[in-house]
Amino acid sequence: MRLMTKLGFRALVASCLIAAGAAANAQVNVLITGVGSTQFPIATANFANEAGLPQQVTSIVRADLARSGKFTNIDAGSTPVPETASVDLGAWKAKGANAFVAGSVNREANGQYKVNFILYDTVKQQSLGGLSLTATDTTLRTAGHKIADYIYQKLLGVRGVFATRLSYVIKTGNRYQLQISDSDGQNARIALSSTEPIISPAWSPSGTKVAYVSFERKKPIVYIHDLPTGRRYMVSDQKGNNSAPAWSPDSNTLAVALSLTGNTQIYTVNANGGGLRRLTQSSSIDTEPYYSPDGRWIYFTSDRGGAPQIYRMPAQGESAGAAQRVTFTGSYNTSPRISPDGKLLAYISRTGGGFKLYVQDLQTGAANAITNTNRDESPSFAANGQYLLYATQSGGRNVLAAVPSDGSAPPQILSVQGGSVREPSWGPFMQ
């Protein structure tokens, strides 16, 4: 969340940084385009036997590849090509495609579908393998995302994130909704609907739970929502503010910011709500904890130096080692997020009267702004570290945007109909 002046920093923390299943009506449309100077040309033929299906797997695969910004879809015509067909790879290379995809969707006796495909390298004139997936009416979209992930990894050498999920908060009128969607913003489901603010959703590393802060009881309380069952339970309802939940890499612990004894400090609590333990012992505001991927460190925001900056301490707390300042570019930095490989720090910096998303190399300390927007907040890395999702403002509305984490292309605004959207969190790889 964005924090303002030092006075505003304290006031906002004291109020838990207020800012703002059934199927969801509002859909976030996710698009990341223009990444890099070149895009990989690929032709994906219509999968055989798709007519009349509730979801067209071919369309999902093509859309995923296009919105990644890494691929150009070459027209493959309208004729279905099953994975068993003999393919003239030279002809597809002549049409400008460096890769070709063929596949089929077959309904089985039990009502499920068998989705098969094969990926070809038309330049080397060879198969790059494929998958055979089982799907239902409701998971055909997931099958399409998994196929796109396979293609992305085989051709680019990086694991794809199309089969991951997003969480975010949409405010329409006086109602807040915590929504969970596919990575393309489609298939959105409502996890919680309330007339009180919902903030700080955070995915568990397993991808099966989302922690968040709800004000439904007129004060900030940390909950965990179990996605497979739809059940939720309270994790932290201490005196004062309970805010900023962050999962440990093993999913057993949450770091939280509590004002239990006055100034907000960093604590840990077991995922079942027990074992509360204080980690920071400062007279300042310590908030927004975030674990490093290896579990050794907790990064956090503190004004102990006079203005908000990002620090890190051992995961066991300051009793195991003094906190060290990490950010030195800019006089006001908040909202730390660490890339999945542990090499990059994303944060929000106050710059020229606005707030911009920065990325810092943790080894060299070099930090650069990677957006052209000016009201940025709540950064979240994709599971492969290639992209960052964040909240910002456009046209007077709260929106989400996505940008390559290396800043190689300008951010793309993600649209949502009928409401303002913020508090994004990009989920992990699905197991």
Swiss-Prot record:
Gene Ontology cellular component list: periplasmic space
UniProt keyword terms in alphabetical order: Cell cycle, Cell division, Periplasm, Signal
Pfam families: PD40 (PF07676), TolB_N (PF04052)
Signal peptide, first to last residue: 1-26
Location of the protein in the cell: Periplasm
GO biological process: cell division; protein import
Region Disordered, annotated ranges: 411-431
NCBIfam families reported in the protein's UniProt record: propeller_TolB
Subunit relationships: The Tol-Pal system is composed of five core proteins: the inner membrane proteins TolA, TolQ and TolR, the periplasmic protein TolB and the outer membrane protein Pal. They form a network linking the inner and outer membranes and the peptidoglycan layer.
Entry function: Part of the Tol-Pal system, which plays a role in outer membrane invagination during cell division and is important for maintaining outer membrane integrity.
Protein name in UniProt: Tol-Pal system protein TolB
